[in-house]
């Protein structure tokens, strides 16, 4: 039904000479996914040392391992932005309240989430407590998004059509008050990138909106190994002030949707509000056509929920801070020096390799910990490849290699030269396998539905007291009315995730709305979401 939005199945490289061992009954993470998915997610984040809640309600501390993932995502996505002609800049964190008031629908959409600065300093009162002092003449909004403040700069920069297009991206933090925080998925402060562009014509701006959606789709699919469905948001789900919002939607392992990225065609709404005008080729004054688009640290939560298992994190190699960890087994003092020497030699050979345009990241773990403890630490952190090297391996000239996308007790014994030769191939195999596995899961839990009864049954858990994992994505006809959309949201907490983009592989399919009996221009994607 929507196959045209997905890449073809990947080849999964076979592993030879496997030494399969029976998996332990206990798992490293409790509870398991099928027992309590939300708590499982929190435990995976904690066990992998990705992040933790801050003392500031709704905020998080991103720990080095989690930030290493973000750095890789940032570096790779930034290169894709630059390849499409965009440059980076930075704009103020604080936005005058009057700037927001210029665009009424934008203000209304963000009003409940805004943090406001009202005073310029602190002073000690008579009781010896610090209190706000010196009220500001105009309150300042702490950046929830930057269309208005960036628009003020663009209004100064743009005078003529010759100044266009402006193609700028910003890496920044934003603040939106969050009542129900969840690490990476919903936090009051989070990291993101936001692109903001101005164009001479509507056609150019619409092309930019579509192009950046395609950049996001490629990045999430090929770098994060998460398949997505590209589409347009319904009017009620549209970005405040936008004419059109395009999005990519991913399914995670509890069958809920996560909005993985958005690209907005803003028309001339924000250019009129900010005064972005230029002299046209005909000599007349025209308002610019603008776009904005963004992705955030929410993507890290998407990766965790899409790939992690009951033993911890599973990282796609392309964004892993470490690709391969070497675990020397040095239980006997008389062989310790020889084992470490061999491990250091192997690490050097592997570090000389290049993976995905950068040096292969290899960790040689020489900590004075038991081999089992070290092994499980790296399992929980999701390192793609683990290599064990001990005295017996020195004699045989082999090492034990474990892939994180395989059962944790599974090992492949490889001669050292073969490991060096095949390391990149193995990483590519893991990357492709994770994507194919996620795609198969998504497709298995996506259903074409043609009746209201089947729709309600699909999204209703069998056990209301403690709902089991249920539902998924439903492709069903909708008449386009807000009333139907709101009724489904009220009844089932199900929303229209997107109206899938039409292409030659996915022509629109007119039909009848399964809720109202009215005419439908095509099926839309429904689901529960984060």
Language-model features and meaning:
Residues 1-2, 281:
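Intrinsically disordered, low-complexity segments enriched in small/polar residues
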Residues 2-3, 11:
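Acidic, Ala/Val/Gly-enriched low-complexity intrinsically disordered segments
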Residues 12-530:
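NTP/phosphate- and nucleic-acid-binding module
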């Amino acid at each position: 039904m929507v196959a045209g939005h997905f890449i073809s199945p990947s080849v999964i490289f076979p592993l030879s000479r496997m030494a399969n061992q029976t998996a332990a009954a206990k798992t490293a993470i409790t509870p398991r996914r099928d027992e309590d998915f939300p708590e499982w997610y929190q435990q995976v984040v904690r066990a992998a040392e990705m992040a933790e809640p801050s003392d500031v309600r709704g905020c998080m501390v991103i720990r080095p391992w989690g930030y290493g993932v973000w750095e890789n995502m940032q570096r790779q996505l930034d290169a894709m932005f630059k390849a499409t002609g965009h440059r980076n800049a930075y704009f103020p964190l604080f936005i005058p309240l009057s700037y927001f008031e210029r665009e009424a629908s934008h203000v209304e959409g963000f009003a409940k989430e805004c943090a406001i600065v009202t005073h310029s300093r602190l002073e000690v009162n008579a009781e010896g407590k610090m209190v706000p002092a010196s009220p500001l003449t105009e309150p300042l909004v702490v950046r929830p998004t930057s269309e208005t403040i960036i628009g003020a700069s663009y209004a100064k920069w743009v005078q003529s059509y010759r100044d266009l297009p402006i193609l700028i991206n910003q890496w920044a933090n934003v603040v939106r008050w969050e009542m129900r925080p969840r690490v990476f998925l919903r936090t009051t402060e989070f990291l993101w990138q936001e692109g903001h562009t101005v164009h001479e014509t509507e056609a150019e701006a619409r092309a930019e909106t579509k192009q950046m959606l395609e950049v996001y789709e490629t990045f999430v699919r090929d770098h994060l190994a998460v398949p997505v469905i590209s589409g347009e948001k319904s009017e009620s789900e549209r970005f405040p002030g936008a004419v059109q919002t395009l999005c990519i939607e991913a399914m995670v392992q509890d069958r809920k949707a996560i909005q993985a990225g958005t690209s907005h065609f803003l028309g001339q709404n924000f250019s009129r509000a900010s005064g972005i005008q230029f002299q046209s080729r005909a000599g007349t004054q025209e308002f610019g056509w603008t776009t904005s688009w963004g992705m955030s640290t929410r993507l890290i939560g998407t990766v965790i929920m899409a790939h992690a298992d009951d033993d911890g994190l599973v990282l796609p190699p392309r964004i892993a801070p470490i690709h391969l960890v070497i675990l020397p087994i040095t239980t006997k003092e008389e062989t310790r020096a020889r084992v470490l020497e061999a491990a250091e030699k192997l690490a050097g050979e592997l570090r000389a390799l290049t993976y995905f345009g950068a040096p292969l990241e290899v960790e040689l773990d020489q900590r004075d910990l038991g081999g089992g403890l070290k092994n499980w630490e790296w399992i929980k952190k999701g390192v793609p490849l683990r290599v064990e090297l001990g005295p017996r391996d020195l004699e045989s000239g082999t090492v034990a290699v474990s892939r994180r996308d395989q059962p944790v007790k599974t090992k492949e014994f490889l001669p050292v030269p073969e490991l060096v030769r095949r390391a990149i191939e193995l990483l590519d195999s893991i990357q492709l396998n994770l994507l194919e596995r996620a795609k198969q899961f998504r497709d298995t839990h996506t259903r074409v539905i043609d009746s209201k009864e089947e729709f309600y049954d699909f999204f209703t858990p069998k056990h209301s007291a403690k709902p089991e994992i249920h539902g998924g994505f439903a492709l069903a006809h909708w008449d386009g009315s807000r009333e139907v959309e709101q009724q489904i949201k009220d009844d089932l907490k199900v929303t229209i995730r997107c109206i899938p983009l039409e292409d030659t592989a996915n022509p629109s399919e007119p039909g009848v709305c399964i809720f109202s009996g009215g005419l439908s221009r095509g099926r839309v994607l429904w689901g529960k979401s984060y």
